[in-house]
């Protein structure tokens, strides 16, 4: 990125844009670094309505979403093994029953997003849907994961349905679409749906993950040889998605806490989670980080 000339103060719009880019770059690095610390960001956080039938029931950074329908509910991401108790408390605080969850989805088969699935499956009897690329990872309790299988495992679960790229999953008239966005994990999935508010329809994107975990090589990866090409595919896919509400597997991807505080102050219009510019900036920053590492690794090759 070109260095700005010191010709005078930035305009408000330029300042906001630069702040967004710096934040996104920081998130791209911090989200990868957080993998070093077990249960990072797994502190209790208030459950709240984002818009329409879409609710946040996750923790400070480990995001979980409740999507309510007349025929039962979706739950996207289950957190660590001890996260389900907080998810349940949030669901019930919002006036819903955890036993009405019918489908458990996930963004990726890393332990911070799926270790709680066994608890929730037992509690709710819900069906587990997962990327067809990560069925084996979930059913092995993470042992076959290309990055963390050697270090961190979790209770294995039975996957009831293997989700393919582009598949639409419908419950009670509400549809979520799966977009394979691999690289961060081999079956990382970005989900999309639509919500409505005041007669207007909004496109929601739940980013599955774009960071490169610590210690992961993009060139000559021993257990994930196609990782670099998968990342390239992911950025093409993310750029193709229409996004109004920018959400993700980690609250840090999209500044969740700050946006929640703005919404809680009351009267925030538009809804602070409507952030298409923030989405584009996030994707730009994540791709730049990927390309920088890829270039550096190629230079170091003999």
Set out the residue ranges of the language-model regions.
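Accessory terminal helices/loops
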Residues: 29-40, 198, 212-302
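Bacterial N-terminal signal peptides that target proteins for export
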Residues: 13-22
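Conserved beta-strand hairpin/beta-sheet module of binuclear metal-dependent hydrolase folds
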Residues: 40-94, 98, 191-212
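Active-site environment of divalent metal-dependent phosphoester hydrolases
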Residues: 83, 109-115, 135-138, 186-189, ...
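Intrinsically disordered, low-complexity segments enriched in serine/proline and basic residues
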Residues: 2-3, 7
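Active-site neighborhood of phospho(di)ester-bond hydrolases with catalytic His/Asp-centered motifs
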Residues: 76-78, 101-110, 128-131, 180-183, ...
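Active-site HxH/HxHxD metal-binding segment of metal-dependent hydrolases
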Residues: 82-85, 92-168, 282
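Metallo-beta-lactamase
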Residues: 36-37, 43-44, 49-51, 100, ...
